Regions:
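Active-/binding-site microenvironments in catalytic and ligand-binding cores
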Residues: 1-247
Length: 247
């Protein structure tokens, strides 16, 4: 039997991620959300000059075999280093999607400031260890850069996001702020992360789904979504913190 679990969080009022929902003249509503807020993916262009955009990254980089590493012992603003990952990550294979599970959201809801305050973070040694494993992508259920804790107090510059610099700089995509990773009981499983189809974007909101019961690679990845390329509905902004942004 094949079962699936969705790992995207709800879009609702948030102290750090501005969102707005309003109705138009039809039986519909318009949603305004940051593409790097809530559950989303990062393409290398998010932080890396001349890095690949979401359009240039093949969808199968976000789909395939995944391996789970439990890093919950690092809750409470503790670093995730290479020594811990070496001990916990024995099941990692080249080309996997690596899923780092801290269970942060189970202890501190991501709508609270404590979610950032008590999040673990990857230090440089941990980030480099992940790159050495040559994964397709990495999934996080926590804000993985130490510098992210300062976002509510000051403008954090691009170079301070060292985990982003190391991992996106190695052409490895992120899936950030996943939830319900505690429901995953297997060390290896299939994971599909389905991003919104934004033209030449440095990332976008996505829905990661873990699937259990598939025995082999018996699938083909085809994107059937239309591109949001109308300037009336898609606008990009260059921020002071993320100074590469969209192309």
């Amino acid at each position: 039997m094949i079962t699936a679990i969705t790992h995207s969080n709800l879009i609702k009022k948030h102290w750090n991620w501005h969102s707005n929902i309003r109705f138009n003249n039809f039986s519909d509503f318009i949603i305004e959300i940051p593409k790097h807020g809530f559950t989303h993916c990062d393409a290398p262009a998010h932080m890396i000059k001349n890095g690949k955009s979401l359009t240039e990254c093949k969808l199968d980089k976000l789909c395939g075999w995944a391996s789970l590493i439990d890093v919950s012992e690092c809750l409470g603003d503790k670093p995730i280093n290479d020594e811990l990952l070496e001990k916990k990550g024995k099941n990692i294979l080249e080309g996997d999607i690596i899923v780092l599970r801290s269970n942060l959201n189970d202890n501190y809801p991501n709508s609270s400031e404590d979610y950032w305050k008590f999040s673990p973070f990857l230090d440089d040694s941990g980030s480099k260890w992940l790159v050495e494993k040559k994964p397709k992508a990495i999934v996080f259920d926590f804000p993985q850069d130490r510098a992210a804790k300062d976002l509510q107090f000051r403008i954090v510059k691009n170079h301070e996001f060292t985990e982003h610099q190391i991992i996106l700089g190695a052409d490895i995509m992120h899936v950030e702020h996943a939830i319900k990773l505690n429901l995953i009981k297997n060390e290896r499983f299939y994971l599909f992360s389905l991003p919104i189809n934004l033209p030449n974007a440095d990332g976008g909101n996505c829905t990661p789904i873990s699937i259990f019961g598939l025995k082999e690679k018996d699938y083909k990845i085809v994107d059937h979504s239309s591109v949001m390329d109308n300037n009336d509905i898609f606008k990009s902004y260059l921020t002071l913190s993320f100074n590469n942004g969209d192309q």
